Amino acid sequence: MLLAIDVRNTHTVVGLISGSGSHGKVEHHWRIRTESEVTADELALTIDGLIGDDAELLTGAAGLSTVPSVLHEVRVMLEQYWPSVPHVLIEPGVRTGIPLLVDNPKEVGADRIVNCLAAYQKYGSAAIVVDFGSSICVDVVSAKGEFLGGAIAPGVQVSSDAAAARSAALRRVELTRPRSVVGKNTVECMQAGAVFGFAALVDGLVNRIREDVDGFGGDDVTVVATGHSAPLVLEDLSTVQHYDRHLTLDGLRLVFERNRDNQRKLKQAR
């Protein structure tokens, strides 16, 4: 059983994955709040409480974090609490199998890399990956499995909260799909702007990528969405073909499998 840990700015997803290769399957997953000052001990208590007796079945662990301080604590946690379990953390120097054809590869977020890896491996084609998180990342992977870059926009909830915070007449609202794009009250107006507005933003970016990037104008390009906020706008997206809620966890599994032998040798050497 593989323990997968996906730490983002707002929330963290913890998953347990059985099998490998094409037989890999996310058996359980949990979503918890990310705390930037969390300690390794606190992480261990939380994760051990979530996975319970399955902790005895762990054969590996893989993790990423868009919060550098938490990545350090994840490393300490794995080394102290599961020292016999080989682990891989997505950071510079780790083999991902995805060439990064960008100006500064070290700037590319680990989440973006593993998402593109998972999409390329799963669908076997060039792909556009849309991750709906605290930011919306629209990333591009070529038919050769190369990361070509992408676009980043503020996330749906972040934008709605910012509008409420910067305006005396607006307040924070629950983001659900409104009955119409023409709101009849302030809450519906904000919901319409968020849901329909961001659907249009994503469709616009995907269409622009298809127009501007060589080889992306045909039907052999897969467009896949992931992320906790994706279901909010899926119904109104015309460009997205697939929704894969576990894309990042699958990507972590793929990177672990690529680096597994090296990690086992390191554990044995100790």
From Swiss-Prot:
Cofactor remark from the record: A monovalent cation. Ammonium or potassium.
Pathway info: Cofactor biosynthesis; coenzyme A biosynthesis; CoA from (R)-pantothenate: step 1/5
Any Pfam family matching the protein: Pan_kinase
Principal subcellular localization: cytoplasm
EC number: 2.7.1.33
Essential cofactor(s): NH4(+); K(+)
Entry keywords, A to Z: ATP-binding, Coenzyme A biosynthesis, Cytoplasm, Kinase, Metal-binding, Nucleotide-binding, Potassium, Transferase
Sites where the protein binds ATP: D6, V7, R8, N9, T10, H11, T12, V13, S134
Enzyme class of the recorded protein, top EC level: transferase
Record GO cellular component, one term: cytoplasm
Binding site for K(+): D131
GO biological process entries: coenzyme A biosynthetic process
InterPro entries: ATPase_NBD, Type_III_PanK
Compartment annotation: Cytoplasm
Catalytic center residues: D111
Enzymatic reactions: (R)-pantothenate + ATP = (R)-4'-phosphopantothenate + ADP + H(+)
Binding site for substrate: G109, A110, D111, R112, T186
SUBUNIT field: Homodimer.
Function (record text): Catalyzes the phosphorylation of pantothenate (Pan), the first step in CoA biosynthesis.
Record family assignment: Belongs to the type III pantothenate kinase family.
Protein name as catalogued: Type III pantothenate kinase
Encoding gene per record: coaX
